[in-house]
Regions:
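Bacterial N-terminal signal peptides
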Residues: 1-6
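Immediate post-signal peptide segment of exported/extracytoplasmic ligand-binding proteins
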Residues: 9-23, 40-51, 125, 148-159, ...
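Extracytoplasmic "Venus flytrap"
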Residues: 20-36, 57-62
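Short, polar/charged alpha-helical segment
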Residues: 28-53, 167-170
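Extracytoplasmic small-molecule ligand-binding "clamshell" domains
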Residues: 37, 44-45, 51-71, 76, ...
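Contiguous mixed-secondary-structure segments that line small-molecule binding/active-site clefts
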Residues: 39-43, 71, 76, 81-180
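Short helix-initiation/N-cap motifs at beta->coil->alpha
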Residues: 55-68, 164-167, 180-193
Length: 195
């Protein structure tokens, strides 16, 4: 994921401020402890002058709309996956490619080094959005309501929810699946209805 922020210099110098930090996952999910820890540390290190309200469950905006909302100034901060950032900044697809990283340690080494620094600068220059941190929330798992997936052959024709990201859509087509671009927040309903 990408922990992103869009704050104007004016608001950052305005004294006591409250900002909203949104994410699309449920309370208690992988994003939530990160967001709550950030809120705690922001208040601590600002001596209480900065309050961060964590808004889970896409209360502010769906994750695939969060980046644009930050650019428009309607959302202060968001935790966004690379899949949902890349439509707004295509270079992000380099990090969305499957198997581009050997493991978490390799990903952090690349993203927290010169490559990540260069990417963050290019993103800021092009969009006005700052990345505060890169993170990892888990491996990509496959869940479906049809059958167990034990081999690539089991993917053939299987409807699979993917983000609205062309790299992911193309990847799952190559796996033999029938990818359906769908926001994460809509996935539980889609699984229940079989869509």
């Amino acid at each position: 994921f990408f922990f992103t922020v869009s704050l104007s210099v004016q608001s950052a110098n305005a004294g006591n401020i409250t900002i909203n930090l949104g994410h699309g996952n449920t309370e208690g999910s992988a994003y939530d402890p990160l967001a709550k820890k950030f809120a705690e540390l922001a208040e601590k290190y600002s001596n209480g002058s900065l309050k961060v309200k964590v808004r889970c469950c896409a209360q502010l905006v769906k994750e695939d709309e969060a980046f644009k909302a930050m650019q428009l100034g309607t959302v202060d901060m968001a935790i966004i996956t690379g899949n949902n950032l890349s439509p707004h900044f295509g270079l992000t697809d380099a990090f969305v490619l499957p198997y581009i990283f050997q493991n978490k340690e390799h990903a952090y080494k690349v993203l927290e080094g010169p490559v990540g620094d260069s990417y963050k600068k290019k993103l800021l220059d092009a969009t006005g959005i700052t990345i505060l941190a890169f993170g990892f929330v888990g491996d990509r798992d496959f869940y479906n309501s049809r059958k167990p997936i034990k081999s690539m052959a089991d993917m053939k024709g299987l409807k699979v929810r993917v983000p609205k990201n062309q790299v992911m859509i193309d990847t799952f087509k190559e796996f033999g699946a029938a990818p359906i671009a769908l926001p994460w927040a809509d996935t539980p309903t889609a699984l229940q209805t079989g869509t």
